Amino acid sequence: MQTTQSSCPGSPPDTEDGWEPILCRGEINFGGSGKKRGKFVKVPSSVAPSVLFELLLTEWHLPAPNLVVSLVGEERPLAMKSWLRDVLRKGLVKAAQSTGAWILTSALHVGLARHVGQAVRDHSLASTSTKIRVVAIGMASLDRILHRQLLDGVHQKEDTPIHYPADEGNIQGPLCPLDSNLSHFILVESGALGSGNDGLTELQLSLEKHISQQRTGYGGTSCIQIPVLCLLVNGDPNTLERISRAVEQAAPWLILAGSGGIADVLAALVSQPHLLVPQVAEKQFREKFPSECFSWEAIVHWTELLQNIAAHPHLLTVYDFEQEGSEDLDTVILKALVKACKSHSQEAQDYLDELKLAVAWDRVDIAKSEIFNGDVEWKSCDLEEVMTDALVSNKPDFVRLFVDSGADMAEFLTYGRLQQLYHSVSPKSLLFELLQRKHEEGRLTLAGLGAQQARELPIGLPAFSLHEVSRVLKDFLHDACRGFYQDGRRMEERGPPKRPAGQKWLPDLSRKSEDPWRDLFLWAVLQNRYEMATYFWAMGREGVAAALAACKIIKEMSHLEKEAEVARTMREAKYEQLALDLFSECYGNSEDRAFALLVRRNHSWSRTTCLHLATEADAKAFFAHDGVQAFLTKIWWGDMATGTPILRLLGAFTCPALIYTNLISFSEDAPQRMDLEDLQEPDSLDMEKSFLCSRGGQLEKLTEAPRAPGDLGPQAAFLLTRWRKFWGAPVTVFLGNVVMYFAFLFLFTYVLLVDFRPPPQGPSGSEVTLYFWVFTLVLEEIRQGFFTDEDTHLVKKFTLYVEDNWNKCDMVAIFLFIVGVTCRMVPSVFEAGRTVLAIDFMVFTLRLIHIFAIHKQLGPKIIIVERMMKDVFFFLFFLSVWLVAYGVTTQALLHPHDGRLEWIFRRVLYRPYLQIFGQIPLDEIDEARVNCSLHPLLLESSASCPNLYANWLVILLLVTFLLVTNVLLMNLLIAMFSYTFQVVQGNADMFWKFQRYHLIVEYHGRPALAPPFILLSHLSLVLKQVFRKEAQHKRQHLERDLPDPLDQKIITWETVQKENFLSTMEKRRRDSEGEVLRKTAHRVDLIAKYIGGLREQEKRIKCLESQANYCMLLLSSMTDTLAPGGTYSSSQNCGCRSQPASARDREYLESGLPPSDT
């Protein structure tokens, strides 16, 4: 049995704990089979509420409340209606669970509190989490508790819990047992006020007032005052005193109409203050309490209390669950709190706490209808705190609402606030782990600078800065996030000073973000918040690039978190689909602008193009789009007409003079040069088209000054232009490399088979030519590896070069060629050189497979072969297990005494492998066919005689081995190959288009001439670099900088297309079946509310009719009295009509109904 700490009023007054001198506390064990236990504290009615609240939080370790619901109702046995029982058992407990609320109720097992205790018990039994629990605190006066003597003796047994008998149904007069379903009890002792109930009420009011002045950080980074709501269910007339005093303390009340008792009295009279007279109140009390007899003095006193309560209509919310039961109780509670905060000032600050509460409860519908209904003018600065809460707690609907209501993200998002958002990352998330890793790396770097700096490092939880965020993004996006979250002044300087080791160039945290929507989008993507990220994507610019960047981030994070790889892959597909759909919208509107969108450098993503981002993200579906393929086809053919027959190209190869004939069709010449003033204002469609359709060097030629007339004649310009157009097209470069590579393989074959002479006769002339040819291949590989991108470090260039599998193949082929040539020059290892070169020829020949990628049918087969090789690699693990198991066993059975290593290797690995294909050595297994020798001289070169002792076991193992390998494992391999083929072949078109892009990009960047003539192209590149001439005209086909006016025009056009796409998506969502059903249900709710309003209007109209009828009756009586000749008649009828008239008058005053005419 668990012990407890108890203290009583005998302790010294200077105890450290604030409540020690005045509080007695302990534990209660309730009898019965449930083994329930609760904590209690005995307090005087004069105890400070702060001490009691501190005890609840500090000693009892209750979670700080986000809401306090004080339940007020009947403390006598009562019959509970079914709907009211559901409201208490389901609605109240659900609201407390979802909002983290405390329920203050009576501690006695009687009346309303009994049903609340049963609801708490049912929830505790059904809940599977210890973190989600309902906190119900029972408060009662000690004078009303049954078996009080057990509690009075708590100070005598400090270390043992009190055993309370399980007689919950035993009610002896005013005494009632404690409710065993509750876990915490506050028992109030009678004080100087005399009555225990008066002391209890005083303590309840003071505790509620104190809690309402405390603050909590629920739902975000800000603090709000803890809202306290009193819920009135049923109740007796004495409850009016508590309600009146509570509303004077500005405590909001929710009154459940239809629950009976004083709640129905308030529901009937509080909305009609003109009827709050003693006669009408007496009528209501008699109807609601028919078995009670009240004095006129009590009725008058209660009427005064009703008038005081009705004077605070903004604190009273009447709700009838029978007629308006479509809303949950937490919704009604939030509406009551919002209503209580409304004032005549209409200042936004008066609604902030309720708005924060709506954010914490995720009730955007209430925020729209009750707070953002047009009555309050919200400024952007008013919404900054709640915007932070909505972002941290992942409430995209609220973020959208705040932006629509006037929040300015450009003013809101400073670098300091962005850093604060990254500080709020969940410690269990992958992003937190990555940021912590980068933070630790930075601490180690700083610690290595010196002991003094190491002592200055912060201690405690890591406070991530934007430097760590930029490093994480750098790992995911590489060059696409270059310069993110760094000092802008440093980035703008030309040739900045070298940064000291460990020093961070961070932006000023008070500066506003340069692109707030992009930064918030990245923050949401890194936390895998798709809905939030989608909204930021919709609000930002450069949508295609942003979606592809998110696709890349999700792909990288899925590799780091294998458990959530499937979910992240689905998110990745969604982002890729966003980019694909938006580009489809753009391509359908304008092809030229869509092509420019693919190759323009995006300023928000470090001047990276959409094609580069798609390549990094491995977005195969994006490359398979018709618009992207049309652009690639345009790049592939260059300035030649698409669809030119290959034979004509080969004819131009053999006879270059055919280039200047009409054999091959070329595009029209570039437009005439224009003035710089015209280029700065590309407003006309013709000017824009000339920009978008211009290619590479032509764009620069548009801006060049006119040449001197004698520089080049028109004929020479025509010849030079045609020559460049033909030899500069990627298709020509590809065909040239294919033809020359076949020539290289033919020369290699000739040298190996015919003209490969040993020294000193060799090498021959053809072999020297082969050496020179390979030398030009080496130069081209060096150019591809180290001279492709000037803005990248050499190490990274080499890393990117090695990542390509075909480049690895080239490196192996060149390495083997160098080794083979070196060996063949030495006579002693000439044959070894021949062997290496023969193997190298096989590697060079396999390099031809790369050429097939351009073919639509053969291209996907390359991927199939590559994936099948991976399948074979894993299959070999299974096969090797059986090979080794069977080989070692048979070797031990047949040749136990043969220790020759070469023979052991043959029999353990080689022979079982051959047996898979049917080569079974019967001469070793069958005794009649054994052919061996036992002579020691012959044993060295021949097989040893097998041991036939376990011949039957060897045969059995052979049968088992063949069954498993030939039937089971081979069929497994075939099934794996079949699955791989189906997966790739099912998406063959997408895989081929993705391969086609890589091939086009590769040959687009290659020099025009093929090896060995490529040496001329390399010399030309070197000369252009020496004389500082632009040697990268072709790069502008895939990466282009547009003039600022045209660039802004493209950005605006893309934004418009994104809005069109989003409107189309929204229309599809509205037309979906689920949305139609939701709208129908919403309309039904509106109709129900409207009908409920009609009922209220009907009641008011009846009331007005009754008043009008009564006025007409009085006027008629006055007319009859004052009319001539009516005195006698009136006096004659005075005795018989005066009393009935008075009765009718009182009946009207009580019920509001007109008197009968009969």
Swiss-Prot record:
Strongly expressed in liver, heart, testis, brain and kidney. Detected in fetal liver, kidney, spleen, brain, heart and lung, and in adult skin, eyes, spleen, stomach, small intestine, colon, lung, bladder, pancreas and thymus. Biallelically expressed at all stages and tissues examined. Also expressed in subsets of taste receptor cells of the tongue, in olfactory sensory neurons of the main olfactory epithelium and in the vomeronasal organ. It comes from the Eukaryota. InterPro entries: Ion_trans_dom (IPR005821), TRPM (IPR050927), TRPM_SLOG (IPR041491). Residues 755-764, 825-831, 894-902, 939-950 are extracellular. Residues 488-507, 1127-1158 are annotated as: Disordered. Pfam families: Ion_trans, LSDAT_euk, TRPM2. It catalyses: Na(+)(in) = Na(+)(out); K(+)(in) = K(+)(out). Disruption phenotype: Mice show diminished behavioral and nerve responses to bitter, sweet and umami tastes. Glucose-induced insulin release from pancreatic islets isolated from Trpm5-deficient mice is significantly reduced, resulting in an impaired glucose tolerance in Trpm5-deficient mice. Multiple phosphorylation sites regulate the Gq/ TRPM5 modulation axis, with the Ser-129 playing a substantial role in this positive modulation. Monovalent cation-selective ion channel activated by intracellular Ca(2+) in a voltage- and temperature-dependent manner. Mediates the transport of Na(+), K(+) and Cs(+) ions equally well. Activated directly by increase in intracellular Ca(2+), but is impermeable to it. The activation mechanism of TRPM5 involves a multistep process. Residues 903-938 dip into the membrane without crossing it. Residues 1127-1141 have a biased composition (Polar residues). This is Transient receptor potential cation channel subfamily M member 5. It is found in: Cell membrane. The lineage of its organism: Eukaryota, Metazoa, Chordata, Craniata, Vertebrata. Keywords: Calcium, Cell membrane, Coiled coil, Ion channel, Ion transport, Ligand-gated ion channel, Membrane, Metal-binding, Phosphoprotein, Receptor, Transmembrane, Transmembrane helix, Transport, Voltage-gated channel. GO terms for cellular component: dendrite; monoatomic ion channel complex; neuronal cell body; plasma membrane. One of its GO terms (molecular function) is sodium channel activity. The chain crosses the membrane at residues 730-754, 765-784, 806-824, 832-854, 864-893, 951-985. A motif (Selectivity filter) lies at residues 917-919. It comes from Mus musculus. The keyword Transcription regulation does not apply. Homotetramer.
